[in-house]
Amino acid sequence: MPLAPPVGVVIANHNNCAFVEKAIESVARQTVRDLQVVVVDDASPDRSDEAIRRCLARLGDARFRYVKLGTNLGQAGALRRGMTELDTPFVCFLDSDDLWYDDFVARHLAVHMNADFPVALTYCDSHIIDADDRILAGTAWWFDSDKPQAKARRTIAPALTPTIDPASGELTYPRNDGVTFHPQWSPAGATNTTASMMFRRAFVDLVLVPPSHELRLYVDFYLSTFAGLMTGTIAIHEALYGYRMHGGNSHSNATVPGGAYNSANREWEPIRSYVLKMVQRVLRDEAETLRLTFGEERHSIAERLMADAVGELPIGRAAPAKARLPELLLGLLGDGLSRLGPRDRS
């Protein structure tokens, strides 16, 4: 019988000394054992280096390697550096303040191996947890938020409600085997955070081409948009990880007021526009390669969808990304620090 392929993991860290050990340990506990794992510290000024070295020494796991950067590269740069250490057809990126549940890799890899259609990206739902690993919400409301029933009055199935151990307080959720194939990107849709995703490595190598200084954050939004445009995506309808909201996140705040709440600590629309325009530029600049790989029709549809979302690109010139940024967003993406390639895009 055929064997499952190995999976690569990059844990990119910046200033998360309080949580990075839990992230590393969650990868070590994965039921799939054929892993290559790289922990990248993105020049953290806190005690992250000490925490990472202590954790790796305690584990004594030969699958783990450690790279400490002397200069902060941001999220894209740190992830690229980590990927240079990997030789796997699939890759995942775990934010160092989040944690995976034990079957995260197994569930994603099984869905990627489906006998229906191969995609570049699978992503899953998440629990929202606090700094002490306590669950604040049983789902990320934005996960697959374009589904028709998202805003409908409805009965919530008992299978979506956990049992609570009265002695320990431990929550147990029933297993949810549901998966959904999304054949095309939609501006109304959403996936989930970086830690929810498993990518085909060849796809990441193909499209993660913007210079690192232009993509210091929001690599998840960039890659998931590209995956939806070029290959389609598959959603796994079970929370397979804990997305931690602790008050010091690069993007999110620490509150869950309920409803379709805004989890960001800054305005989303300028960020969304910036990243989509970056996708649009790469569709143009890498057109020959993308057409050869995915076909003329798929590329043309992607260009049209981006034009509908953010407008047409200027004809005959490529304006520098920073020149189009409002001052607030320039500060965020130009100087922001990562939580968290074969080509040198620094």
Predicted regions and their residues:
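General helical structural elements
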Residues: 83-84, 204-205, 248, 276, ...
